[in-house]
Design a protein with these regions (language model features):
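Phosphate-binding site recognition
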Residues: 1-140
């Protein structure tokens, strides 16, 4: 049984906004952020790319070579070629942001690229924005 949360309505509103930006969701541990995002993703997108930086440390190299969306997507595809990146129909979900805060730098470039929606999630205990190399104004 799924317990509907406030975040569910927020995610629906975000999806309806044609000018949506990459989304960072932060909150306490173990409150259902990942479960809510995952449920939303599979109900609304044809393709879901979920990367958990705790469970899959190998993805911490996806910004090698640059933070632009094309480079990040290329590096993800090199690690797991089975994932489908379908423009306009794919959500990229970066979970456990606090373990790889550098990925936040790429969000500006995903916004400019515009082909894919992006949601990041992380715990308040671990997110330290002063550890992020570059902070783009208007994208946090």
């Amino acid at each position: 049984m799924y317990l509907r949360r406030k975040i569910d309505g927020f995610l629906d509103e975000w999806k309806e906004n044609e000018n949506r930006k990459p989304l960072i969701i932060k909150g306490p541990r173990q409150v259902g952020k990942t479960e809510s995002i995952r449920r939303f993703a599979y109900e609304n997108y044809e393709s879901v790319i979920e990367i958990n930086f705790v469970l899959s440390e190998k993805y911490r190299m996806i910004t090698d070579g640059g933070y632009d969306a094309s480079n990040v997507i290329k590096n993800i595809s090199l690690i797991d070629p089975s994932w489908d990146f379908i423009p306009g129909k794919t959500l990229i979900f970066f979970d456990e942001l606090q373990e790889f805060p550098e990925i936040a730098t790429s969000l500006k470039f995903f916004r400019q690229d515009g082909r894919f929606d992006v949601i990041c999630s992380g715990s308040l205990l671990g997110i330290s924005y002063n550890r992020i190399e570059s902070n783009s104004v208007g994208y946090k």
